């Protein structure tokens, strides 16, 4: 996946390369310390996108989801400091991903910095 924290501020493309937005934070699985979710500013709102399968390609991060799926994702009212519980389950259902590897995920920079990026 490359150096995930350096992805903050990087453009995000969907699985076919269409622009989605910019990474404004990375959420790590608290149990494994692995990146689990990317907080992306789409210019319209902040959305969380699974980090699994994301690849660094040139100066972009490419995620394995269509832009339409990302645009339709449930969005937090404000960036959470920790992603867990029902919000995590709603996102997992939306993207069709398993969440057993991420019982709780903490943001690298936290909600204040991510909110500034919005």
State the predicted function of each range.
Residues 1-118:
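Peripheral interaction segments used for macromolecular assembly
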